[in-house]
């Protein structure tokens, strides 16, 4: 438990009230699409979350399980808050019908989309996501209707060997 003197400059909504972690960055969510896979199947890239609910994308979507992945849980939660429970679950139920595979972690969808195993991945959008566009026939897409996000936290482990150095870093 450590609260940096610099933490005061960070909005309270992006840090733990008890000082266990501080938000280092915001990680937005979106889609990574394999252009070749979608073209081969005559599909256009989705532009919105609601597009993913269209049955034409059946078995083309991979995402991490929100029961396992904190990032995917944050994506689910953010969209539900924006849409409201009733509309949100209606849309996610339809998206679920189109998801072929729920990965164990948030790092799995990107490589599988790049490999052409799936046309669409739902994932955290990092600098690395956009770098994939240079190596693979993929496009990273920020959805037009909303961009859910999660804070990327920084913290010091309780049993860290060099807490003084960690405090300087944090």
Q: What residues fall within each predicted segment?
A:
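Periplasmic-binding protein-like
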Residues: 91-96, 102-103, 134-158
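A bilobed periplasmic-binding-protein/Venus flytrap-type ligand-binding module shared by bacterial periplasmic
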Residues: 32-37, 77, 150-162
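Bilobed periplasmic-binding protein/Venus flytrap-like ligand-binding cleft at the lobe interface
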Residues: 47-55, 152-170
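Active-site-proximal beta-strand/loop segments in catalytic clefts of secreted hydrolases
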Residues: 35, 64-66, 124-126, 143-144
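Loop/turn elements at helix/coil->beta-strand transitions in domains of secreted/extracellular proteins
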Residues: 57-61, 116-119, 136-138, 164-167
